[in-house]
């Protein structure tokens, strides 16, 4: 899977929204995000920039970018967000609502949390 820098920043924006949706940020959630960004070969010095720009990106711009991605990229984003939501073992209603909303706005494929986790594990 390939993403350009702006796409990664948009994904980071959504990932940040997901980890803060329930009002608490767990170490497991931040670890999943770090692992995925590094998996794409992003140098450690660029990770900080992507992270900070993702936090600052307007949600409407992030959803616009993600909505223009290919079907496979969208499947990855849906699975990534679902995995972030599930990794701490506690799926909060606010996280689930955000996942559904982002999926609807961006045209992400519908999948269960189980399918999201399996997809990410299979593509690790």
Regions found by a protein language model. Name each.
Residues 1-124:
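Small-residue-enriched hydrophobic alpha-helices in membranes
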